[in-house]
Amino acid sequence: MANKVIKCKAAVAWEAGKPLSIEEIEVAPPKAHEVRIKIFATAVCHTDAYTLSGADPEGCFPVILGHEGAGIVESVGEGVTNLKAGDTVIPLYIPQCGECKFCLNPKTNLCQKIRVTQGKGLMPDGTSRFTCKGKTILHYMGTSTFSEYTVVADISVAKIDPSAPLDKVCLLGCGISTGYGAALNTAKVEPGSTCAVFGLGGVGLAAIMGCKAAGASRIIAVDINKDKFARAKEFGATECINPQDFSKPIQEVLVEKTDGGVDYSFECIGNVKVMRAALEACHKGWGVSVVVGVAGAGEEISTRPFQLVTGRTWKGTAFGGWKSVESVPKLVSEYMSKKINVDEFVTNTLSFDQINEAFELMHSGKSIRTVVKI
């Protein structure tokens, strides 16, 4: 099948705000420096829902969503030397070409080699590999994992341990790595520090896990859904706070509870008001707040400049700061050696035909991550 078009099932988003539709699509063979992957498992993330809602300024339709997947290489295009058919892989929405000025700078993981075309839903040559009912279907985040087969750039693939369970490690393609790395790489949480994590979805729980791994002595979990508190404590939170239980702003509550504020805070929701609260909950002189959640298009953050003048730092992170191609295999190895939790994030497993139910579960707040077996 290496040089042939493959017909397979995919969940197509024909337009914004409508449920996904399981369709038979055609997947063209990989061109030069591309890889065709058989996807075995994918998770559903808030970013997929954000794009499907129509709020994403880069959202284009019709499209095959999905960016937390894992599978096996089916075939490779001309010039691909780092991968071969049969390799176990995780597709990456942030590539690592190793050559652009971003890849060569140790301060960032934001490879820009294919950013322009990826943002338009196209492969690096400006075309798509997907068609359905005679129409071109766009790619998503360079990955499109809601399909039995997908085609990605060879710089957007991490080769991983072939014994890793794909229905678990697919989560390392986004959420877990993002939260975990926000604590370890972006904030660089230190032993004995006090941390606050706002938002206890998958990313927030992973941030708690990262704070614990870094040796934080106090980890305060903040959410308006108290049903999430027990799980937060399982991941390492030392205490949990519901802002709705207080008559004053949550940042004031945290400053009082922590003798002046936390050393590190993490906003894992994408709410600009919470981003402000997370910054203002930080300790004067050295507190660091990391924006992890993605806010809606056009939204802006605000605070009094005095908050920054007096020594607080506001930072942002994408994919937890991990340089993807080199880091994801290491994260999989850490999971295999039980250094990081992954299984505990999977609260539901569904069949491909039930993919719309996965979105419903996520919106209900009752699941952390739902894995869809393709």
UniProtKB/Swiss-Prot annotation:
The modification Phosphoserine is found at residues 247, 324, 351. Zn(2+) 1 binds at residues 45, 67, 174. It catalyses: a primary alcohol + NAD(+) = an aldehyde + NADH + H(+); a secondary alcohol + NAD(+) = a ketone + NADH + H(+); S-(hydroxymethyl)glutathione + NADP(+) = S-formylglutathione + NADPH + H(+); S-(hydroxymethyl)glutathione + NAD(+) = S-formylglutathione + NADH + H(+). Its EC number is 1.1.1.1, 1.1.1.-, 1.1.1.284. Pfam families: ADH_N (PF08240), ADH_zinc_N (PF00107). Binds 2 Zn(2+) ions per subunit. Transmembrane segments: none annotated. PROSITE patterns: ADH_ZINC. Homodimer. Belongs to the zinc-containing alcohol dehydrogenase family. Class-III subfamily. This is Alcohol dehydrogenase class-3. It comes from Oryctolagus cuniculus (Rabbit).
